[in-house]
């Protein structure tokens, strides 16, 4: 039986859109202005997948999604904000999905330094 690539593509886009909405709702607890960046569906690459945060957020979902590819995509489209990729790995064995945050090391260091200044410095 031939594969219906149009249906597969639509299902994949729907899964991605659902993850973007879910992620935006999760991030609202931290950044109340967080919302799905719907601009990419009209103009392509103009807004992050989740907007209203201090980061350019790229959201990816699938079975073993490409984390480096997600970061590369974010960095190519970013507007100067630090980039993060929030990657949801759907398991094929119906186990709970893994969610990862991928960022450059310098972004991580900036985040830790900002946090440490909020709590009185790092104890090393």
Where do the language-model regions lie?
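Catalytic phosphate/metal-binding cores of nucleic-acid and nucleotide-processing enzymes, i.e., regions
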Residues: 1-124
